[in-house]
Amino acid sequence: MDFVDFDTLNLSDDLPQPQRALSLPIATNIETFGRKFYNLNSLTRNLLKRDNNTDTEKSENQPQVAEKYANLSLSLIEDTKNADNDHQEPHSDIKISALSARLSRVLNNPLSDSQIRQIFGSLEDTLRSWDSILEPGALGSMSRRKLRGEIERTLIRNQTQTLKEYQPVIKNLRKLEENVDALRSASMGVVDSVNNDFESSEIFNSKMENLHRKKTAVVVKKQLLSAFRAKFTLNEYEEYTLENGDISDEFFTVLAKAEQVDQNCSILLSIDNSQLGVKTMARVNRLVTRASEKVVAYANRTLGNLYALNNRDRVRTLHQCFVYLRHRPHYLNSVLATFVGSRSKTLVDEFLGQANSRVAGSSPQSEEYQDPVRVIGDLLAYIHSVVVSESETISGIFSFENDSVDETSRKEFGEIMNDCVAKVLQSLAKPVRAKLEQIISREVRISVLFSIHHLAELYYIMFSKQIKQDHMGLVATIESLVESAELRIVTTVENKLTTIRNSNSAQLQLNIDLQPPEWIIDFYSEILPMLDQTHTESIFKDNSLVNMVVDQPIQIYEQHMENSQVKNFEKRDKYILQLNCLDLILSKIMPISVLTDKVILVNEKIKEVSDKLVETQVSSLLEESGLTDFYNIVNMICPINDDFFDVSIYEPITENKLFTEDNIRQVNSKIQAFLPTALLDIQQSLFKINSPLVVNEIITESAIKYSRFYGRFQLICDEYLKVPLLAWSDGEVATLLGVEDAYFDEQ
């Protein structure tokens, strides 16, 4: 077995000695060794089978060699036990230990499948030549030497490959060694140089520290001086900008800085030497005051020349002036007052020029008399154009860009704009009021006054929408113009009615034809179309005009009836004349929506006069039929026209001397002679009433009342005289009077 221990065992024996079993720590790989190679069992069986065959062959062919080896082994065992036990035991342990370590390192080393496959392939090749290796002769010795040489070559090759892997590392380590030596020598030089320089740097550091401390003090002083100068003083250029520079963005920037300096100087008053703060504040205040006055002058100059507002840069600068002056109300109010005064004077002069020379080549006075509506319309149109133009101009002055001011400032300037517009336009209030009221006061035509009123109302609405804030200005003036027109209308109508009231010719118009007087027709023909065209009820808010239009004409013709020849007319004719006048008034005012309440009043008066005429007509029927005395007697006992009727109530009539059969027969004769033509007589007496409805109503009601009395009186006669003296029934009487249907419906 010298092929196994060729590198460790150097025995002088010819044959190898048997060795005891090795104790190998190969538990890890040996347990999984069979699982890695599925054909390990078959390989083992083949090897065992081959060994058996070899042993059999050797036992057959060479029994002598086997016997020799067996005897030799036994003798060696005995010698080992007896003679060399003490000497061989340590050496054997060493060999066993070395072999165990090698085998365990080999077997426990984790190998890949390919490496294991290669190992076992080499082992298989070795096992194939196992027979020649085990031969005891020269051939076996040569085979074993060959195997030993192959193993050595393999081992050398493997070791050489392993050493080749470390060769680059060794080369790098040698190069690194050179670099490390150079670095070590350089570091030693640096350390020596640093040690030499350290001593000299301490002196240098102390000097640098002193210089740095001085530099810090100088820098602090410089910063303090710079901060003081920036916070409490203005440089020469900034002072020049405030005193002599143009109004621009730079000017307002410097002005804001000057105001900030003025505020900051207040802290200087608290130091020991307060003169510095006082002088600084006085100088800065003087600069700020001059700059503010300069801003005010620029704003006044720009607002005084509206053509300059066409330049956007100038407008933007003006807006900056407004923003600056917003925090100084006395300056801003001064600018606005100057602007309002200038614009007010200009507008008043232009209006007076327009009013005095409106039409070239004609007399303004004559035109005002001929066509006052046109004159007032032109003046109001001119004023409206002035309002629109002035509103747009002032709105353009106070309209800021989106990013120039905040929302609060924009709202504040919007209020200032509306206030300026109101104040400027307020200057037109007095001249406009004087001129228009002068024209209205001279006008006496109702149609013209109504046209002026409508025109003034229209422009009042337009001015109210255009002017946001008025302060008793132009809008109030137009409103007063509307009121003046209303008052003038009422006064004119009242004067006209007064003239009619006192007119003798109007009284003479009441004649025997019982028709309404002509002045009523003329009056309503003039005034009602004007009322019909009125779309607002402001003119009727106090009902004075309505009362004059309806109530006073009624009062006037009633007064005329009392004072004229009509007072000698019969009562029926007076009532007919009243009905005709009221019917005419009703027909005139009914289409006018604003006179709806008066329509109800006139209807009530017509009903009142109609009832009087019905009573007159009933009295006439009773008188013609001889029933007047009996009618009075019955009504003295109990009113005959009540809905409740009982014959027993009228028993006291029997005590009256007139209630006799002879008198009743005479009444019956008169009735039979009168009633057949009574309807024609009634219609003839009411022929002069203009309204057929009123005539029909009077005839119907009077006939029904007469028929009702006749029927009830007939019952009284039948009850207490016991003889039917009245030939006709109440139904027949109603038929003769043409009201049978209405009478029976009432029953």
Swiss-Prot record:
- A biological process from GO: intra-Golgi vesicle-mediated transport
- What is this protein's record name? Conserved oligomeric Golgi complex subunit 6
For this protein, the record's InterPro entries field holds: COG6, COG6_C, COG6_N
Q: Which organism is it from?
A: Meyerozyma guilliermondii (strain ATCC 6260 / CBS 566 / DSM 6381 / JCM 1539 / NBRC 10279 / NRRL Y-324) (Yeast)
Q: Which UniProt keywords apply?
A: Golgi apparatus, Membrane, Protein transport, Transport
Functional note: Acts as a component of the peripheral membrane COG complex that is involved in intra-Golgi protein trafficking. COG is located at the cis-Golgi, and regulates tethering of retrograde intra-Golgi vesicles and possibly a number of other membrane trafficking events.
Regarding the membrane, this protein is recorded as: Peripheral membrane protein
Cellular compartment(s): Golgi apparatus membrane
Query: For this UniProt entry, which residues form the secretion signal?
Result: none
Q: Which family does it belong to?
A: Belongs to the COG6 family.
